[in-house]
Every structure is written in structure tokens, then in C-alpha cells.
Amino acid sequence: EIILLFLIEGYALDIIKFGIERRADGPGIDIGRQVSNAIKLLAVNIAYYLIPAIIIFVLGLFLRDWILTIISIILLIVFALANFMARCRLAKTDSLSDALAVGEAIGDISKVGIGKLIATVILVVIIAIVIMILAGIIGSINDLVGDILFGIALVYLIFFYHRAIGLLYSNV
């Protein structure tokens, strides 16, 4: 099961790369490369969520209540957006060090445009919700058809989401 998740994450990185390159085709399956990409993505995700967690923990020793909550939310949003950019940097360069360059990833947010980035994320989430609701409605009629449709919808959404991120980053 973990290997399958690694394959999906590695394939998603290839989808981002194809989006950045504005290629019309889809990436092929290369298990070795995709597992390697997934391990790199895991390192990137740990780094981009560990940094704000440590900062929030340290600030929590000194700050209390609402100010810590506001700072925490801002930090998590900034690092989540930077994580999007880090994924794109990893897909584009295949370099873990480029992806872990936090300052440059944060700088890429302004190159893409924070409004465009947030609007894309919101649009993708809305589309995903609509598709999953439709799959759920159909699934309530027939379990087997619903399960099959849910699987197809999930694969499509993974492809769509990562393609959108790649296309967004293609102008950087």
C-alpha cells in the first residue's frame, strides 16, 4: 500500500513536470523514477511543514492565545504555498536542493502571483468537491458503480490538480 502511494506521488510529480513543459501527453510509468521522486517529495513535505511547526512551537513558549493563532495560520499558509512551489521546482529541475531552497520557493509565490495561486487552489478544490459529490450521489444508487466511479474520479482529480499546478508554474 505504501509503495502504491509512493508511485502515485511520484507520478504526480511527473504530471507537474509535463504541465510546466506544457506537454499535451501524459507521463509514462517508470516505477524506479517515481518511487525516487516520491521519496524526494516526502523530504520536501517534511521540511516545509517541520519549519513552521518548530517556529510555532518556539513562539508558543512566549506568545499566547489569539496572536499565536494568527501567526500560526499565516505561517502555515505561506509554507503550504511555498510547498506548492517547491514541488514545481523539484519537478522542473529534479534537484532536491532546489526544492529545499525555502527562500527561493517563497520568492516563486510572488512570481506566479499569490492571487493566481490561491484562486487556482480554490477553483481546483471546488471542482474536486463537485466531482466527488456527483460520484457520491451515483455511488449511493449502486455501490459497485460508485466505487468504480470514485476510483476513476480520484485518478482524474490527481491528474487535474497536479497539471494545474504545473501549468501555473510554467511561466516562472
Which role does the model predict for each range below?
Residues 29-54, 81-133, 169:
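Interfacial aromatic "cap" segments that immediately flank transmembrane helices
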